[in-house]
């Protein structure tokens, strides 16, 4: 299966031949990267790059939750707006969101208006603050260092792994929501905990060093 974060797994327009040059670029990219410039920049600059900044990891975890049931490009196009309305993803502030603020967000057509997902922002912020070392915990599921995979094509890329299942179980126990194993594996891919650029992608050579 294709990676969940960074792809529209429902799209039938991406050929199995996988990586290919896009928009005149000499780069060869992963099979899931479509021709949207925002998507291309995300693939080339963010996806799979090891992330250890607590604030950015928290933001990414929330964005993963927003993506549930949707394509990643849907969230990516709204990321800047989410940063505006969610106080720059400042965890302490989001932990104090009031019910009235959540209801106000439900009126904003520029974001995904899902009450359960918006309530999860507050729930997950509080759970995050309760962790002594959230970054250490998240990276512990891959032994503290990126797990470099060597997948040749989309059929080899998993949607769930034992590490993702362990992360999901631990986060749920800690009080997080919207952290099922599929979401957790997508999170691991995006944050560089696992490196899942396929071997024919130019980013593979860079990130597998």
Regions found by a protein language model. Give the residues of each.
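Short hydrophobic transmembrane-like helices used for membrane targeting/insertion
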Residues: 1-4, 14-16
């Amino acid at each position: 299966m294709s990676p969940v974060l960074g792809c529209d797994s429902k799209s039938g327009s991406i050929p199995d031949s996988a990586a290919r040059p896009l928009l005149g670029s000499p780069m060869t990219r992963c099979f899931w990267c479509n021709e949207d410039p925002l998507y291309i920049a995300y693939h080339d600059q963010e996806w799979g790059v090891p992330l250890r900044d607590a604030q950015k990891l928290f933001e990414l975890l929330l964005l993963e939750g927003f993506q549930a049931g949707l394509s990643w490009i849907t969230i990516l196009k709204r990321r800047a707006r989410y940063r505006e309305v969610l106080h720059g993803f400042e965890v302490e502030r989001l932990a104090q969101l009031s019910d009235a603020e959540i209801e106000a967000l439900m009126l904003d057509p520029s974001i995904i208006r899902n009450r359960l997902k918006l309530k999860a922002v507050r729930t997950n912020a509080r759970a995050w603050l309760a962790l002594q070392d959230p970054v250490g915990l998240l990276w512990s599921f891959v032994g503290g260092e990126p797990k470099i995979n060597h997948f040749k094509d989309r059929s080899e890329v998993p949607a769930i792994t034992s590490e993702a299942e362990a992360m999901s179980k631990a986060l749920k126990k800690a009080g997080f929501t919207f952290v099922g194993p599929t979401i957790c594996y997508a999170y691991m891919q995006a944050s560089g905990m696992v490196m899942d650029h396929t071997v024919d992608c130019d980013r593979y050579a860079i990130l597998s060093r």
